[in-house]
Swiss-Prot record:
It is found in: Cytoplasm. It holds the Pfam family CsrA. The lineage of its organism: Bacteria, Pseudomonadati, Pseudomonadota, Gammaproteobacteria, Alteromonadales. This is Translational regulator CsrA. HAMAP family: CsrA. GO terms for molecular function: mRNA 5'-UTR binding. One of its GO terms (cellular component) is cytosol. NCBIfam families: csrA (TIGR00202), PRK01712.1 (NF002469). Keywords: Activator, Cytoplasm, Repressor, RNA-binding, Translation regulation. It comes from Colwellia psychrerythraea (strain 34H / ATCC BAA-681) (Vibrio psychroerythus). A key translational regulator that binds mRNA to regulate translation initiation and/or mRNA stability. Mediates global changes in gene expression, shifting from rapid growth to stress survival by linking envelope stress, the stringent response and the catabolite repression systems. Usually binds in the 5'-UTR; binding at or near the Shine-Dalgarno sequence prevents ribosome-binding, repressing translation, binding elsewhere in the 5'-UTR can activate translation and/or stabilize the mRNA. Its function is antagonized by small RNA(s).
Length: 65
């Protein structure tokens, strides 16, 4: 895992097309902005895990998503 320190307004690059910008810090919360092409899905981890679980449930029951 790469660990970086960024200040509000600073950005990091992931590849050539994805940027992550620190928008704000308040207490123990950090607001970030992600710019990525439409074909790259961006989800919070808990949403991604729910999507994967639903895919697995649908595949197990023979349904296509």
């Amino acid at each position: 895992m790469l660990i970086l320190t960024r200040r509000v307004g600073e950005t990091l690059m992931i590849g050539d097309e994805v940027t992550v910008t620190v928008l704000g810090v308040k207490g123990n919360q950090v607001r970030i902005g992600v710019n990525a092409p439409k074909e790259i899905s961006v989800h919070r981890e808990e949403i991604y895990m729910r999507i994967q679980a639903e895919k697995g449930d649908n595949e197990a029951s023979g349904n296509k998503v």
